[in-house]
Amino acid sequence: MFWRGGLPLVTIRNLLDNGVHFGHTTQRWNPKMKGFILTERCGSYILDMRETIRGIVTAVDFIRDTVARGGEVLFIGTKRQAQQVIFKQASRVGQHYIAHRWLGGLLTNFSTVSKSLVRMKELEEARLDDSVSTKKEQLIRGRELQKLRRSLGGIRNMTKLPALLWVVDTNREGIAVEEARKLGIPVVAILDSNCDPDLVQFPIPGNDDSIRSIELLTGIVADAVAQGLVERHKAPQDDIEPMAEWEKQLLQSGDSSGETRPISGTDRPLDGDLSKGPAPQDEELSD
């Protein structure tokens, strides 16, 4: 058992039980990942879970401290295996997410994206007043709103650039990683055996194709965010923003000492039912 801040973080058994150690076939690999690979078995690489533990410990500290100082996290995972996990875990701790498709310039041209967010909210308000438009206009606006929600629903409340990114599959999300690099935004990411570790500041070697692996690691990241939120609101009241209602509920769900629940991997309770899908504004997450 590895410990951090008095809480159990994760175990090698957690990682193995969730298939985090499985890499790609030996034909699909990045030589820069050599230091994170333990061995080869049956034509596939086995990742070194000791390196994964080190990556998790370092990343959790950074995420917790960043959120405690007021930073926000953008969760990114648009591959089918990651969509529901990203939506669920980011929503659980009130963070932003992209789970459908990354829009080029979302970070580097955020001022333009912000205008689209304003437009989305205008359309939502206009939809409540059916008397100001014809049925045809309502249909056109409805389609525009659906498109905006599909692309930007997960960042509807993002008013500034995130302090860090959590990325599932840096190869697929290469544009997002590159935009973050240009802006100096740190990236925490799952790195499979075919990824480039030089592109991220906080690599966590792991299987980025397995739903169980993605859920375990993303859940750990979300728990680190939750711990950071608790620490943020332990600061002097004059130095922090008023606590949002969802943050009050998060604190109330902890124990009497104010600690968040332990990060225990496979024993983590799930919030809601994945089979029910995302919230209404994100009902088209899947391709």
Swiss-Prot record:
What GO annotations for molecular function exist for this entry? Answer: structural constituent of ribosome
Alphabetically list the UniProt keywords. Answer: Ribonucleoprotein, Ribosomal protein
Q: Which CDD domains match?
A: RPS2
Q: Name one GO biological process term.
A: translation
**Where are the residues of the annotated region Disordered?**
233-287
Which ranges are annotated Polar residues under compositional bias? 250-259
Family note: Belongs to the universal ribosomal protein uS2 family.
Q: Which NCBIfam families does the protein's record reference?
A: rpsB_bact
Query: What name is this protein filed under?
Result: Small ribosomal subunit protein uS2
Organism (species): Tropheryma whipplei (strain Twist) (Whipple's bacillus)
